[in-house]
Amino acid sequence: MSSTSAASAAGQGALPAYDTPLGITNPPIDELLERTSSKYALVIYSAKRARQINDYYNQLGDGILEYVGPLVEPGLQEKPLSIALREIHADLLEHTEGE
């Protein structure tokens, strides 16, 4: 008897096979696309912001503070791209197409 049929037999119903991954699925891509003119603009927008966040972390040891750090509370070991996508989703950034 498989584990799925065993769970059904026990009356528990179907259980998810895995946890929902974080990152690109949170915030949802459809909601992010509402904030830009195209998926390509979203890629460029988020990549530029992720690079700024990465440069911010790299310069902390030098004491220069030329770049702006994360505008949302970063999670433990959260990647700069995930932080940038959360900032875009929260409308914390201003973006002009073509820049």
Curated annotation (Swiss-Prot):
Pfam families: RNA_pol_Rpb6 (PF01192). The keyword Nucleotide-binding does not apply. InterPro entries: DNA-dir_RNA_pol_omega, Pol_omega/Rpo6/RPB6, RPB6/omega-like_sf. GO terms for cellular component: DNA-directed RNA polymerase complex. The keyword Nucleotidyltransferase applies. Residues 1-10 have a biased composition (Low complexity). SMART domains: RNA_pol_Rpb6. Keywords: DNA-directed RNA polymerase, Nucleotidyltransferase, Transcription, Transferase. One of its GO terms (biological process) is DNA-templated transcription. Its EC number is 2.7.7.6. Promotes RNA polymerase assembly. Latches the N- and C-terminal regions of the beta' subunit thereby facilitating its interaction with the beta and alpha subunits. This is DNA-directed RNA polymerase subunit omega. It comes from Rhodococcus erythropolis (strain PR4 / NBRC 100887).
